[in-house]
Amino acid sequence: MKTVFAILFLAFIALTYARSYEDVKEEIKNEVEKEILEDLEKETDELNERKINDAKPWRWVRDIRWRKLVPFIPVVVAAVGKK
C-alpha cells in the first residue's frame, strides 16, 4: 500500500510541475530549428572552404565583353611592341 501511495505522490508532483503541452511543443520546435540552422552554417562553411569543381572552367571567358575590348587590342599590341 505504501508503494501505491508513493507512486501516486510522485505522479502528482510530476503533474504539478509538468509544463503545459504548448510549452513543450514550442521548446521542441525551437530546438529543432536551432539544430537545423547550426547544420546549415556548418555546410555553408564547408562549401566556402572547399574549392567548387566547376563543370565549365572557361565560363568566365564568355562573360568578357569582347565588343568593348576589341578596339583596344591594336593599342595594347603597339604598346607592347615598343618596349
UniProtKB/Swiss-Prot annotation:
On whether Transferase is a keyword of this UniProt record, the answer is no
Chief localisation class: secreted
Propeptide segment residues: 19-55
List the record's Gene Ontology CC terms alphabetically.
extracellular region
Assigned keywords, A-Z: Amidation, Antibiotic, Antimicrobial, Immunity, Innate immunity, Membrane, Secreted, Signal, Target cell membrane, Target membrane
On the tree of life, the source organism's domain of life is: Eukaryota
Q: What is the protein name given in its UniProt record?
A: Arminin 4364
Q: Where in the cell is it found?
A: Secreted; Target cell membrane
Name the organs or tissues of expression.
Expressed in entodermal epithelium along the body column.
Signal peptide location:
1-18
Does this UniProt record's set of keywords contain Signal?
Answer: yes
* Residues bearing PTM Valine amide: 80
**Can you tell me which family this protein belongs to?**
Belongs to the arminin family.
According to its UniProt entry, the function of this protein is described as:
Antimicrobial peptide with a broad-spectrum antimicrobial activity. Keeps its antibacterial activity under a wide range of salt concentrations that mimic physiological conditions of human blood, which is surprising, since Hydra is an obligate freshwater animal with nearly no salt tolerance. Does not affect red blood cells.
| Origin species | Hydra vulgaris (Hydra)
